[in-house]
Amino acid sequence: MSEREEFKFNTVEEAIEDIRQGKMVIVVDDPDRENEGDLVMAAEKVTPEAINFMAKYGRGLICLSLTPERCEQLDLHPMTPMNTDPKGTYFCVSIDAHPKHGTTTGISAYDRALTIKLAISPDAKPSDFVRPGHVFPLKARPGGVLERAGHTEASVDLARLAGLYPAGVICEIMKDDGTMARVPDLMEFAKKHNLKIITIADLIKYRLRRETLVEKVASAHLPTPWGVFKIHAYRHKLTGEEQVALTMGEWKEDEPVLVRVHSECLTGDVFRSFRCDCRPQLEKALEMIAKEGKGVLVYILGHEGRGIGIANKIKAYELQEKGYDTVEANEKLGYPPDLRDYGIGAQILRDLGVRKMKLMTNNPRKIVALEGFGLEVVERVPIKIEPNPYNKIYLQVKKDKLGHMF
C-alpha cells in the first residue's frame, strides 16, 4: 500500500487556499528523494509569529525560496561555486536586511521576517542587504516542480498559484529527538497544529493538468538504419532550451508505449567511444522501437557526463586514468555521482501522448524520477550490452555503486 493510499492527504486546492490566506501547509516529497516534510508559506504573508513557529516547532533551517529573476535582481550569488548537493538545492549566500531598515542581530523572528519582506519588496536593491546573514535564499528552477520536484520549487509554485508574489518560506520538520519527521509523524504534526498536508507528487499532477513547459516547434521524417522515424524539436517556454525526440508509429493514450529517455553523450553517441555503453544503448533502443513498430526515444540535451558537462566529463576521464572509478572521479571534482533531472523529458513524453511506458533502462533512479512526473512505468525493459575491455570496470561500478540492473 502506498503512502497516498495509507494516509489521508489534503488536496492541492485546499493547500492553495490556505496559502492565499497566509497560513502554513506541510509539503511532503517523494520517499525515494529527501523523504521529508517542510512547513511552507507564502513569503508575502510572513510574520514574526510565523518565523517563531517554524523555529520552535519545525526546528529545521528557515529558507526563502525565490525565482531566478529575483535572485538576479538582488545580486544573490551561489553559496558555493561548485554545488555538490545530491538533490541540487541552489543555496545563495545568506542575507540580513541592512541595519538601516531596523534590524539588530538579524536572527530574531522579527528581523528574519523583516528581511524576507524586504527581499520581495519591488523597491529592494542589493545594497539593502548585508551578507552573510540569517535568512538563506534558495533559487528555484524556472519551471517549478515540473522541472525539479523539490520543496524550493513547490513553495514558489504554491505562492504563485495562490495569486501571491512567487516566493516561499520553508522549514524542515524534525521530531523532538532531532531526527527527521516522516509521513506518519507529519500526519500527527498536521493534526496537532491544524495544518493542511500535501505531496509534491500531487502538486506536479495539479500543474500537469493545467499547463506545460515545452512546445513542439518542428517535426520531420528522419531515415535511419532502423527505419524512418519522426524527429520532433521542442523548446522550453521559459528558458528557450531545446530538446529532441524520435517517434515511430502511433498509440492510444492508455496504451503502454516502448520508451527510451537517453542522456546526451558526445563521446559515446558521436565519437563512438568505448569508455561507456551509451551508443550501444542508443542504437539498441532504436532497434527495439523499430521492431515493435512504435515507440519514443527522448534525447535529453544537457545531460552530458550525468549532468556535469563535457569539460568536467573529460576531467573525470583524466582522473579515471589515474585509478579513480566513474563515481569517485565525479566526487573528486566536487560533484554527486548523478546530477540529472528528467522533468523536461517527462513533459515531452506527455506532449507526445505517452501516459504508460515500457521503459528501456537499466537505471532504477530513472523509473522513480519519471513516475514522479505523473507517468506510469508498467514494465522495465532491460538493455543488455556486452562489455568491452575499456568499459568493463565502468559498467561494474554502475551496477555496484549506482544500482544499475544488468
From Swiss-Prot:
This chain's source organism reads Aquifex aeolicus (strain VF5)
Cofactor binding mode and count: Binds 2 divalent metal cations per subunit. Magnesium or manganese. Binds 1 zinc ion per subunit.
Q: What is this protein called?
A: Riboflavin biosynthesis protein RibBA
Against HAMAP family, the record matches this protein to:
RibA, RibB, RibBA
Q: Which gene encodes it?
A: ribBA
> What are the residue positions of the site described as Essential for DHBP synthase activity?
134, 172
Name the cofactor(s): Mg(2+); Mn(2+); Zn(2+)
Keyword Mitochondrion attributed: no
Protein function: Catalyzes the conversion of D-ribulose 5-phosphate to formate and 3,4-dihydroxy-2-butanone 4-phosphate.
The record places the active site at 338, 340
Catalytic activity annotated for this protein? D-ribulose 5-phosphate = (2S)-2-hydroxy-3-oxobutyl phosphate + formate + H(+); GTP + 4 H2O = 2,5-diamino-6-hydroxy-4-(5-phosphoribosylamino)-pyrimidine + formate + 2 phosphate + 3 H(+)
Region of interest called DHBP synthase, as start-end residue ranges on this chain: 1-209
